[in-house]
Amino acid sequence: MIQKLIKNRQRSKWVLFTGASLWIFFILDFMNSNYYNTESHISSYSIYNVYDNLHEETESPPKSALSSSLLEPSTNQQTSDFKNHLLYKSLISSLFQNTTKQTKDLNSNIYDDIFSNHKLETVLGTLSFKERCDLYFKNVFAEDVNWHFNPDTRYDMHFDKNTKEFKDFIKVKELVIQEKFDKMKEKFKEEDYNRELSKLKKSMFTDFLNEKFEQEIVNRLSTFRIFNKCYITNDETPQINKINQFITNQQKLVQDIHRDESGNFYKSKIDKLKLTNKEALVDLMVTKSSTFEHRVYPWISKEYPVYERWTGKVYHEPPNYYEILNHDPMQKTPKKIQQSNNAAQPFLKQFKNKFNGRGIVLTIGNQHSDYAVSLIHLLRALDNKLPIQIVYYDDVNEESKRKIVTAAQEDFRSLPHSFEKVAHLFGDKYINSQGKGLQPQEVWFVNAYNSIHKNYRGKFSRFGNKLLASLFNSFSEFMLIDVDTVLMQPPEYFFQLKNYQTTGTYFFKDRSVLQRRTVEDGKFFERMGPSTVDQMMFDIPIMTNYTTTRELFRGLQHYMESGLVMINKDKHLNSILMITQINLIGPITGKVWGDKELFWLGFAINGDEEYYFDDNFAAAIGELTPPQDRARKDGTWHHSKEICSPHPGHVSGDDNHSLLWINSGFRFCHQADEVNFEKEAKKKTRLKHLHTADQFRTFYYNPLRITHAVVPPLDQDLQDRKNAMDEPTSGWLWESGYCKRYMWCAYSSVGGPQKRPDEKDDTVDNNETKDNTLDGILVEYNQDEIALFNYLGDIWVGTE
C-alpha cells in the first residue's frame, strides 16, 4: 500500500512538473513569436539586448524605407482615428480655447497603438500620470522590443531610381501616379511625356520619403519629451503639483462629458484599463527607467565630468559651491542637494539633483587660451564674484590651464591710464590693497570627455560643445558665454533681470539682416513640436503664437545670437536635454546655422515656451560714420546715421540705451592677424580717416572705441523699403572688403520719400510725397559711459 502511494505521488509530481514545463515553454514561445523576427539577435543577459550595457557597438540594419503602409493611406496623410472621437473633439475645444495648431498635427505612432486598443475615456478619465507614462512605454516596447535612439541615423534624401525602395514605391503606387499624370499631361507636349512622368515619379517618391522621415523624427521627439517628464523630472514639486491638477481637472471634464443632463452615465461607467496581451507581457521584461535611459541617451556614458578647481583639487561629482565658497549667499540653493547615488534612478535624475549654485560657463580648446585670459581680466575689472566653469573635452593642456589660473589669481593692481576717468564709478574697495588688487576669479576646469560615450564624441564638435556645456556644467543657474564675449555689465546684473527671474531664461537676438529662408522651415519646426495628444496625455503644451509669429518662422534666416545665454537649469533641464538631442537630428540642424537657433527651438520643440528674448535685435556699436564720408552724389547728407563695425552689440530692451554685451572680442578687428592691410587700405570706401596700411594695422589691433549704438529697424513684413533718396532699404549692409569680411554697417533708419523734392507726385493730394521711412534706435553715450567702455577695452586688449 505504501509503495503504491509513493508511486502515485511520484506520478502526480511528474504530471505537475511536465504541465508546468509545457506552460513555461508555451509562454516563452509566445513571447518569442510576438517580439522577435528571424533576424533578431536574442540576448541571454538582458531583454534590452545590445543597447543597455554596450556589449555591442553596431546597430541593427535599418528597416526598408517602404512598408505595407504603402498600400494604405499613410498616418502622415490623414488624421489619427482617435482624433475624430467626440470626446477628443470636446476636450480639444476645452483645452485649446485660445490657440490652435497651425500646421498638420503630427503625433507619435505610439498613440495610435494605445487608442486602437483602449478607449479614450478610459485612458484620459482614469489613469494617473505615472500610469500614463507606463502605458506609453509599454507600447514602445510592444512595438519594438529593441527600440533605441540612434544618433548615427541618416535621413538620406538622395534620389536613385535604381534602388529597390524606389522600384517598390512605383510598383505599389502605379495607378495613383498614372491617374495624377493623366490630369497633368495636357500641359505638356507628347514628346515630353516620358520626361515629365519621370519627374512626377521622383517628386512623389521624394514627398513619400519626406513624410516618412518626418514621422520617424516626430516619434523620437515625442519619446524624448515623455521620457524626460516621466522619469527625469518627475520628482520636482512644481511639476508634480501642476500635472496632478491638470489630470484632476481633465478627469472631471471627461466624467462630465460622459454623463447626461441628469448626471447619469450615458451607457455605462467608464471602464478600467485592461492591458492587452502584448502590454501585459512587457511587464515581464521592463525593469528600471535607469536601464531604459541608455536607449534614449546612448551618447551619455553615465559618468560625471571631472571638476578641477584652480587649486588643483579634483572632484568626481558636482561640487557643493555653498560649502566650498564659505557659505556665499549667492551660491545657496533652495533645494536639498542629493549626496548619494541611487542605481535605481536614471543617471540624469541623479545628476539633476546635484546641481547647485550660480555661475559662468564657457567652453574652450587650447587655441582659445589667449581669449580666455582676456575674458578673465575683464571679469576681474567687472568685480565678478561668481565661479567660472570652463568646460572642455580633453583638449586643454596644462600650459593653457596655468595661463588661465595665473590671469585669475595673480596680483592685478596695475591698471591702464583710462581707469583714472572711471575710478569714481567703482568705490574705494574696488582695488583690494591688502589682497591681489582686482577681484581674483574662482576658476574651475570641467573635463566632460568621459561623460560622452566613445562612439559619439565626434557628434558634438565645434558648436556642439556649447550644447554639452549647458548640460554638464554643475550650476543650477548659469550664464553661458563665448570666449570672445565681452560683458559691459557685471555678471550678477544679468541674473537680476526681471524677465530672467520670471522665466528662468534670457536670450538675445541676432542682427536683423534681411537674409531669408522659406516659411516652410517654420512649419516644419512647428510639426516637430508637441501634438495635441501630447498635451492631452502629458500636459506638454503645443506651440503657440508666442513662438510661431517670430521672424524666423516668417522667413528670416537668423534670429538668435548665442554669445550669451541665461538659463535656470532647475526650471528647464528637459529643454536643455531636448537641445542636445535635436543637435543629432540632421533635418533639424540642416535648417539652422551652428548652435544659435537650437537653444530656443529646443525649448519650443520641447513644449516649453517659458523663454524670453530681449526686445531689441543686435546693434552695431562703435563710432558714427562722418556724414560727409557717405554724402549723396549731390553733396547732401542722409537722414539715416551709420555705424560700420565688426562687432554686434546688445542694447537693453528695458531702456533702449544700456549696452549689455558685445561679441567678437574688444579689438576693433578680431581677425587682424589674417588681414591683408595693404589691400584694405586701397579700397577707400570705408574708414576714410585711415590712409595707409600701417594706420589700418594700428587701428585694427587697438580697442574698439564706442560712442554710439545703432539698432536698425526691421520691416514688419520683412521687406526692403525702396525710396528715391538714396536712403538704405534695409537695416544692415555687409561690407565684405574690411576686417577679413567681418565688417557690417548698420543704419538708424530705412526707407524714405518715394519721390525726390524736385519731382511732383500726381498720385498724392496737395503734392505730399509718400514716405516709408522707418526709424530704429540711435543711442548716444555720455562721457562716463564712454570712459567706462574705454577702460574695459584697455583691460581686455591689455593696454598699459
Swiss-Prot record:
It is a single-pass type II membrane protein. GO terms for cellular component: Golgi apparatus; Golgi membrane. The chain crosses the membrane at residues 13-30. Residues 31-800 are lumenal. GO terms for biological process: mannan biosynthetic process; protein mannosylation; protein O-linked glycosylation. The keyword Disulfide bond does not apply. Its main location: Golgi. Pathway: Protein modification; protein glycosylation. Responsible for addition of the terminal mannose residues to the outer chain of core N-linked polysaccharides and to O-linked mannotriose. Implicated in late Golgi modifications. Belongs to the MNN1/MNT family. This is Putative alpha-1,3-mannosyltransferase MNN1.
